[in-house]
UniProtKB/Swiss-Prot annotation:
UniProt PTM comment: Ubiquitinated; mediated by UHRF2 and leading to its subsequent proteasomal degradation. N-terminally acetylated in a HYPK-dependent manner by the NatA acetyltransferase complex which is composed of NAA10 and NAA15.
Name of the protein in question: PEST proteolytic signal-containing nuclear protein
UniProt keyword list: Acetylation, Cell cycle, Nucleus, Phosphoprotein, Ubl conjugation
Modified residues (Phosphoserine): 53, 77, 87, 119, 147
Bias kind Polar residues: ranges: 139-149
UniProt region (Disordered), positions on chain: 1-84, 134-178
Subcellular location: Nucleus
Positions carrying Phosphothreonine: 139
Residues modified to N-acetylalanine: 2
Annotated GO CC locations: nucleus
Residue stretches of biased makeup (Low complexity): 37-47
Amino acid sequence: MADGKAGEEKPEKPQRAGAAGGPEEEAEKPVKTKTVSSSNGGENSSRSAEKRSAEDETADLPTKPTKISKFGFAIGSQTTKKASAISIKLGSSKPKEPVPTLAPKTLSVAAAFNEDEDSEPEEMPPEAKMRMKNIGRDTPTSAGPNSFNKGKHGFSDNQKLWERNIKSHLGNVHDQDN
Protein backbone atom coordinates (compact mmCIF):
# COMPACT_ATOMS: atom_id res chain seq x y z
CA MET A 1 0.00 0.00 0.00
CA ALA A 2 2.82 2.39 0.87
CA ASP A 3 4.59 1.99 -2.48
CA GLY A 4 2.82 4.90 -4.21
CA LYS A 5 2.84 7.42 -1.34
CA ALA A 6 4.43 10.74 -2.32
CA GLY A 7 5.88 11.72 1.05
CA GLU A 8 7.71 8.46 1.74
CA GLU A 9 11.29 7.75 0.78
CA LYS A 10 12.91 4.34 0.86
CA PRO A 11 16.32 3.99 2.48
CA GLU A 12 19.19 3.59 0.04
CA LYS A 13 20.83 0.72 1.92
CA PRO A 14 18.83 -2.50 2.09
CA GLN A 15 18.41 -3.70 5.66
CA ARG A 16 20.02 -6.92 6.69
CA ALA A 17 17.76 -9.72 7.82
CA GLY A 18 19.35 -10.00 11.28
CA ALA A 19 19.78 -6.27 11.96
CA ALA A 20 17.26 -4.40 14.03
CA GLY A 21 16.29 -0.99 12.69
CA GLY A 22 16.92 0.95 15.88
CA PRO A 23 17.39 4.65 16.56
CA GLU A 24 21.08 4.39 15.62
CA GLU A 25 20.25 3.71 11.98
CA GLU A 26 17.79 6.61 11.86
CA ALA A 27 20.42 8.93 13.21
CA GLU A 28 22.61 8.13 10.23
CA LYS A 29 19.99 9.02 7.64
CA PRO A 30 16.82 11.09 8.28
CA VAL A 31 13.84 9.67 6.39
CA LYS A 32 10.54 11.46 5.81
CA THR A 33 7.62 9.24 6.76
CA LYS A 34 3.93 9.70 7.31
CA THR A 35 2.06 7.71 9.86
CA VAL A 36 -0.55 5.49 8.23
CA SER A 37 -3.37 4.09 10.29
CA SER A 38 -4.11 0.47 9.47
CA SER A 39 -7.75 0.81 10.53
CA ASN A 40 -8.71 3.12 7.70
CA GLY A 41 -6.10 2.16 5.12
CA GLY A 42 -4.62 5.65 5.10
CA GLU A 43 -7.50 7.07 3.10
CA ASN A 44 -9.03 9.39 5.66
CA SER A 45 -6.72 10.89 8.23
CA SER A 46 -8.06 12.25 11.48
CA ARG A 47 -5.46 15.02 11.50
CA SER A 48 -6.40 18.41 10.14
CA ALA A 49 -4.56 20.11 7.27
CA GLU A 50 -3.01 22.65 9.63
CA LYS A 51 -1.42 19.95 11.75
CA ARG A 52 -0.08 18.17 8.69
CA SER A 53 1.48 21.30 7.23
CA ALA A 54 3.02 22.19 10.60
CA GLU A 55 4.53 18.70 10.89
CA ASP A 56 5.85 18.83 7.33
CA GLU A 57 7.56 22.17 8.03
CA THR A 58 9.15 20.86 11.22
CA ALA A 59 10.23 17.69 9.40
CA ASP A 60 12.15 19.76 6.82
CA LEU A 61 14.27 21.39 9.53
CA PRO A 62 17.22 19.38 10.88
CA THR A 63 16.10 18.18 14.29
CA LYS A 64 16.82 15.34 16.62
CA PRO A 65 15.91 11.95 15.21
CA THR A 66 12.63 10.58 16.43
CA LYS A 67 12.49 7.30 18.27
CA ILE A 68 10.60 4.32 16.90
CA SER A 69 8.79 3.95 20.20
CA LYS A 70 6.90 7.15 19.35
CA PHE A 71 5.66 5.59 16.13
CA GLY A 72 4.44 2.52 17.98
CA PHE A 73 2.37 4.56 20.40
CA ALA A 74 1.19 7.12 17.84
CA ILE A 75 -1.65 4.95 16.56
CA GLY A 76 -2.96 4.15 20.02
CA SER A 77 -2.69 7.73 21.26
CA GLN A 78 -4.55 9.07 18.22
CA THR A 79 -7.48 6.76 18.82
CA THR A 80 -7.71 7.65 22.51
CA LYS A 81 -7.55 11.36 21.74
CA LYS A 82 -10.18 10.91 19.05
CA ALA A 83 -12.52 9.08 21.41
CA SER A 84 -12.17 11.70 24.13
CA ALA A 85 -12.69 14.51 21.60
CA ILE A 86 -15.88 12.87 20.41
CA SER A 87 -17.24 12.52 23.91
CA ILE A 88 -16.44 16.15 24.67
CA LYS A 89 -18.10 17.30 21.45
CA LEU A 90 -21.21 15.31 22.12
CA GLY A 91 -21.50 16.53 25.67
CA SER A 92 -20.84 20.21 24.96
CA SER A 93 -22.57 20.63 21.60
CA LYS A 94 -25.88 19.13 22.70
CA PRO A 95 -27.74 21.77 24.72
CA LYS A 96 -30.52 20.53 26.91
CA GLU A 97 -33.87 21.55 25.48
CA PRO A 98 -36.81 22.16 27.78
CA VAL A 99 -39.51 19.55 27.40
CA PRO A 100 -42.37 21.16 25.45
CA THR A 101 -45.61 21.00 27.35
CA LEU A 102 -48.61 19.97 25.31
CA ALA A 103 -51.44 22.46 25.15
CA PRO A 104 -54.67 21.08 26.56
CA LYS A 105 -57.03 19.90 23.87
CA THR A 106 -59.89 22.34 23.52
CA LEU A 107 -61.07 21.18 20.12
CA SER A 108 -64.14 19.03 19.90
CA VAL A 109 -65.53 17.23 16.90
CA ALA A 110 -67.87 20.11 16.09
CA ALA A 111 -65.00 22.59 16.27
CA ALA A 112 -62.87 20.42 14.02
CA PHE A 113 -65.52 20.51 11.30
CA ASN A 114 -66.37 24.18 11.90
CA GLU A 115 -69.98 23.45 12.76
CA ASP A 116 -71.60 26.12 14.86
CA GLU A 117 -74.43 25.16 17.15
CA ASP A 118 -76.19 28.45 16.34
CA SER A 119 -76.46 27.74 12.63
CA GLU A 120 -79.58 25.96 11.39
CA PRO A 121 -79.26 22.63 9.63
CA GLU A 122 -79.46 22.84 5.87
CA GLU A 123 -82.94 22.49 4.44
CA MET A 124 -83.44 19.63 2.02
CA PRO A 125 -85.81 19.99 -0.91
CA PRO A 126 -88.96 17.84 -0.62
CA GLU A 127 -87.98 15.76 -3.66
CA ALA A 128 -84.79 14.69 -1.95
CA LYS A 129 -86.63 13.89 1.27
CA MET A 130 -89.15 11.79 -0.61
CA ARG A 131 -86.44 9.83 -2.39
CA MET A 132 -84.73 9.02 0.87
CA LYS A 133 -87.85 8.02 2.75
CA ASN A 134 -88.63 4.33 2.74
CA ILE A 135 -92.29 3.82 1.93
CA GLY A 136 -92.13 0.04 1.97
CA ARG A 137 -93.43 -1.73 -1.11
CA ASP A 138 -94.31 1.50 -2.88
CA THR A 139 -90.79 2.92 -2.83
CA PRO A 140 -90.61 5.08 -5.95
CA THR A 141 -86.96 4.43 -6.67
CA SER A 142 -85.28 1.10 -6.53
CA ALA A 143 -81.77 1.97 -5.53
CA GLY A 144 -79.17 0.35 -3.36
CA PRO A 145 -77.40 -2.96 -3.24
CA ASN A 146 -80.42 -4.98 -2.07
CA SER A 147 -82.97 -3.68 -4.55
CA PHE A 148 -82.54 -6.18 -7.35
CA ASN A 149 -85.93 -7.11 -8.86
CA LYS A 150 -87.69 -4.37 -6.95
CA GLY A 151 -90.17 -2.29 -8.82
CA LYS A 152 -92.74 0.32 -7.88
CA HIS A 153 -94.77 -2.26 -5.99
CA GLY A 154 -91.89 -3.80 -4.08
CA PHE A 155 -90.08 -7.01 -4.78
CA SER A 156 -91.91 -8.93 -7.45
CA ASP A 157 -91.80 -12.41 -8.75
CA ASN A 158 -92.73 -12.29 -12.41
CA GLN A 159 -94.10 -15.82 -12.40
CA LYS A 160 -96.40 -15.06 -9.46
CA LEU A 161 -97.46 -11.78 -11.05
CA TRP A 162 -98.38 -13.60 -14.28
CA GLU A 163 -100.36 -16.22 -12.35
CA ARG A 164 -102.26 -13.52 -10.43
CA ASN A 165 -103.05 -11.64 -13.60
CA ILE A 166 -104.35 -14.84 -15.28
CA LYS A 167 -106.54 -15.70 -12.27
CA SER A 168 -107.93 -12.19 -12.10
CA HIS A 169 -108.72 -12.23 -15.83
CA LEU A 170 -110.32 -15.64 -15.54
CA GLY A 171 -112.34 -14.39 -12.60
CA ASN A 172 -113.39 -11.33 -14.56
CA VAL A 173 -114.33 -13.44 -17.59
CA HIS A 174 -116.21 -15.94 -15.40
CA ASP A 175 -118.08 -13.09 -13.71
CA GLN A 176 -118.98 -11.56 -17.07
CA ASP A 177 -120.43 -14.85 -18.31
CA ASN A 178 -122.78 -15.05 -15.38
